[in-house]
Amino acid sequence: MSEQAQTQQPAKSTPSKDSNKNGSSVSTILDTKWDIVLSNMLVKTAMGFGVGVFTSVLFFKRRAFPVWLGIGFGVGRGYAEGDAIFRSSAGLRSSKV
């Protein structure tokens, strides 16, 4: 009888793999959104920089203001899209979790 008591231990409750697939944790969703927002802002800023340099060289005799203006437009657009992603469940570029 003592052998049966030792072998029969209560089952440990472990989360199944299916529950991890269906229900994502809040931190995972937030991390995914931050990754999208930061990469989006980096891409928009780089594109603004490129357009600013191109415009500066082509039209403005290599002055600095088109570059800064392009960077400003890129950061502003990235911020606006990031704000839309965080405010709504389906932003301009939503994260699929």
Swiss-Prot record:
Highest taxon, organism lineage: Eukaryota
PANTHER family registered for this protein in UniProt: MICOS COMPLEX SUBUNIT MIC10
Name of the protein in its database record: MICOS complex subunit MIC10
Ranges annotated as spanning the membrane: 36-58
Phenotypic consequence of gene deletion: Partially altered shape of the mitochondrial network with condensed, fragmented mitochondria accumulating at the periphery of cells. 60-70% of mitochondria exhibit an increased inner membrane surface and stacks of lamellar cristae disconnected from the inner boundary membrane.
GO biological process, one term: membrane organization
Function in brief: Component of the MICOS complex, a large protein complex of the mitochondrial inner membrane that plays crucial roles in the maintenance of crista junctions, inner membrane architecture, and formation of contact sites to the outer membrane.
